[in-house]
């Protein structure tokens, strides 16, 4: 499904051209893969998830540097609650379990996340962390990096809490699309117990 050729979409320098390629080439893939993930998440959690695909409606000049789909339990949106994201940048696919700055009660989640530090360090040794979904900066899982993300999320207005994986386009998995898709799905589903814990607060 996802292939290295998909990154060529971001070679188009125009807003109209890039958006058209996103809408006609990537979004159909998001629809298919998103439906698969919806089913897997429903089985794993006994909850109903809605698929949201970025539409870039506020873009009037600069072409988007990335595009994504999100899965949340609300049909009205996803940024104000814990959710999953799978998306493309110009050089990567990203898979995140995300708690974003828009969450109205995000500081309520910080103590619970902090209490899970030991388990996070043991269960997600090969995962990445970030505190800002708008940048490419990511941090490998480590005690210091986890503390950094926790502090940014708890103590700064724009701080976010992102756990997941980044697949750079030179990753050998892109030579085997079926293995890539399976790995992305496994990466996301491994975070389901954390999602359920967070949502049980």
Swiss-Prot record:
Gene3D superfamilies listed in its UniProt record: Protein of unknown function DUF1054 (3.30.930.20)
Q: Report the InterPro entries cross-referenced here.
A: UPF0637 (IPR009403), UPF0637_domain_sf (IPR053707)
Q: What family does the entry list?
A: Belongs to the UPF0637 family.
- What is this protein's record name? UPF0637 protein LCA_0842
- Organism, as annotated: Latilactobacillus sakei subsp. sakei (strain 23K) (Lactobacillus sakei subsp. sakei)
